[in-house]
Curated annotation (Swiss-Prot):
Functional summary from the UniProt entry: Excises uracil residues from the DNA which can arise as a result of misincorporation of dUMP residues by DNA polymerase or due to deamination of cytosine.
Record EC number: 3.2.2.27
HAMAP family from the UniProt entry: UDG (MF_00148)
Record's catalysed reaction(s): Hydrolyzes single-stranded DNA or mismatched double-stranded DNA and polynucleotides, releasing free uracil
Keywords from the UniProt entry: Cytoplasm, DNA damage, DNA repair, Hydrolase
Protein name, entry field: Uracil-DNA glycosylase
Membrane-crossing residue ranges in chain numbering: none
Organism annotation: Mycobacterium leprae (strain TN)
Main location group: cytoplasm
Gene behind this protein: ung
Length: 227
């Protein structure tokens, strides 16, 4: 991640929303550059670390929280759960998300795991921790990203616009207190990982429920359909 002003790295609405933690963002940039200097790589690529914040802040209607990036080289792209279009096979959690997507909405399975269309349509795909060492899950937890991503979530919750937060798993559920506001409805279920998907993720209908809630709050529904 390059040493540039935050306003050059993220969308302007997000630059304002993250102003309270601008020093922390700079500190995380220094941390990542120190990792590289020490011969340690990180994922995703530097230009994708803040990718979730490059889509308009004012357009966000849905928040989907992940834990940290995929630790498999070539998988992490800066959006929670998403992978590059050429990744095969899909990560098992994402495959389970797609199975529920098909069961919930009746759409065919997407041709690839790229969730960019969702991000472009107002879905913030945000990991709580934005980087990871390759093949070392959770290796960057507690380094400082949580302060930044929680600031982002607080900024969303402080708006007046309707929003739905989809929290999958216990880790994401700890954010619920930040989202307990009049303009936000929280949908909770177990995580789509193979260890927990059969305990309540399958059948939870997060996509159709989200749209029902948004319409009920006077907002437009999300077009969830993927190629």
């Amino acid at each position: 991640m390059t040493a540039r002003p935050l306003s050059e790295l993220v969308e302007q609405g997000w630059a304002a929303a993250l102003e309270p933690v601008v020093d922390q963002v700079a500190e995380m940039g220094r941390f990542l550059r120190a990792e590289i200097a020490a011969g340690r790589r990180y994922l995703p690529a530097g230009h994708s670390v803040l990718r979730a914040f490059t889509y308009p802040f004012d357009n966000v209607r849905v928040l989907i929280v992940g834990q940290d990036p995929y630790p498999t080289p070539g998988h992490a792209v800066g959006l929670s759960f998403s992978v590059a279009p050429d990744v095969r096979p899909l990560p098992r959690s994402l495959a389970n998300v797609f199975d529920e997507y098909t069961a919930d909405l009746g759409y065919p399975l997407p041709v690839c795991g790229d969730l960019t269309p969702w991000a472009q349509r107002g879905v913030l795909l945000l990991n709580r921790v934005l980087t990871v060492r390759p093949s070392n899950p959770a290796s960057h937890r507690g380094k400082g990203w949580e302060v930044i991503t929680e600031c982002a979530i607080r900024a969303l919750a402080a708006r007046s616009e309707p929003m739905v937060a989809i929290l999958w798993g216990r880790d994401a559920a700890t954010l619920k207190p930040l989202l307990t506001v009049d303009n936000c409805v929280v949908i909770e279920s177990p995580h789509p990982s193979p260890l927990s998907a059969s305990r309540g993720f399958f059948g939870s209908r997060p996509f159709s429920r989200t749209n029902e809630i948004l319409v009920g709050m006077g907002a437009g529904p999300i077009n969830w359909r993927l190629p």
